[in-house]
Design a protein with these regions (language model features):
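Aromatic-lined carbohydrate-binding surfaces of glycoside hydrolases
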Residues: 21-25, 34-41, 45, 70-71, ...
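Contiguous, structured surface segment used for ligand recognition
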Residues: 1-90
Length: 244
């Protein structure tokens, strides 16, 4: 995946580097030189990508950012005069929260997500929250439980409000979402997770916290608690842990 990253940064750039992946008990990267090529060595693709970012910033004078993930590398790369090594004992480098997915990322397509995953790898992130498509799971589950399309749309929030929906704060606000939305989100999440796995990034997929639609007692006969309102919004109910 690092060769692909290099090609996305600057077409043809992968031919200027030697990428070496070796085993190590700790995450590390090394910069080295073999002839006219720069060597980036690490124990996994994220470590190697982090080493690439270090080289670009401190040797080539190139800084990549959210708004600029491409650059023109020099025809002859600055040499690494002596081997440089960096390692970390911080095994888990987390990224994102639920609000981020609604504030900033609600309408990202694959092109934008690809850049973000590259950016994660360049900065050593290996544990990002991956909640795209959670609404698809809810749609499918509620359908199997007998909820109608209209009822489901009253529960699932619109794209810009799903962070607060998934935090059990509101229902349905900003919806309903078209059928095409769910198809697109399912396909997008599969591409996101696939690319993360290629890098060795471990997506944090949401578990189940006990949230159910506010009418789950009447519709499904469940033992739930009514959490009331949040800032004037009707909140989902909570499934009681003693419910069989």
């Amino acid at each position: 995946p690092v060769q692909g990253l290099l090609e996305r940064i600057d077409k043809g750039a992968s031919r200027k580097f030697i990428i070496e992946q070796v085993k190590s008990p700790t995450d590390f990267f090394e910069l080295d030189q073999k002839g006219d090529k720069v060597v980036i060595r690490g124990n996994n693709p994220v470590s190697i990508a982090t080493g690439l970012n270090w080289y670009l910033k401190y040797y080539a004078g190139i800084q990549l950012s959210w708004n600029g993930m491409t650059a023109k590398l020099p025809a002859t790369l600055p040499a690494v005069p002596r081997k440089e090594r960096h390692e970390t004992e911080l095994n888990y480098r987390y990224d994102f929260n639920y609000c981020t997915h609604s504030y900033t990322m609600a309408f990202w397509d694959w092109e934008r997500w690809e850049k973000e995953i590259d950016w994660m790898a360049l900065h050593g992130i290996n544990l990002p929250l991956a909640v795209v498509g959670t609404d698809v799971v809810w749609y499918n589950v509620l359908s199997k439980l007998g909820y109608s399309k209209e009822e489901i749309n009253e529960f699932i929030a619109g794209p810009a409000f799903q962070g607060w929906w998934l935090m059990n704060n509101l229902e349905g606000w900003g919806g309903p979402n078209p059928d095409s939305w769910y198809k697109q989100r399912e396909a997008l999440q599969k591409r996101i997770v696939k690319r993360m796995n290629e890098y060795g990034i471990h997506p944090v997929l949401p578990g189940y916290s006990g949230m159910v639609p506010h009418n789950a007692k009447e519709r499904l006969g469940l033992n739930v608690s009514d959490p009331g309102l949040w800032c004037g919004y009707r909140r989902p109910a909570f499934l009681q842990p003693t419910d069989p």
